[in-house]
């Protein structure tokens, strides 16, 4: 997998940042899609393109990627009890949007 163009959803979060570091070390071109609800701009890595957007709007991205790592999610338990509809919107509807976009554009999802 040499020099692939890779999209990382949730790329400004803890796991996303560490994955992006590894992908860059391997020589890949990386784009991060994150709405910064929990990710931080301070986590940005040089040479990575960052898109500040919700995963539900992924359909507007040009589908010229080789691979997508889907890490965007609301993972904290307590907020899921406080606002289950938001958790469903992000974790279920958002994941479906990513999967549909990847399928239409013939992009592998990890």
Locations of the language-model features?
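N-terminal Rossmann-like NAD(P)+-binding domain of SDR-like oxidoreductases, especially those catalyzing
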Residues: 1-110
């Amino acid at each position: 997998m040499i020099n692939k163009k890779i999209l990382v959803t949730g790329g400004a979060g803890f796991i996303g940042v560490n994955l992006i570091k590894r992908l860059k070390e391997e020589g890949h071109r990386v784009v991060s899609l994150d709405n910064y609800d929990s990710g931080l701009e301070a986590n940005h890595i040089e040479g990575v393109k960052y898109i500040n957007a919700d995963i539900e709007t992924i359909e507007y991205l040009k589908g010229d990627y080789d691979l997508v790592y889907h890490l965007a999610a609301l993972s904290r338990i307590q907020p899921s009890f406080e606002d289950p509809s938001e958790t469903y919107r992000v974790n279920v509807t958002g994941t479906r949007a990513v999967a549909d976009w990847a399928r239409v554009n013939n992009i592998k999802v990890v």
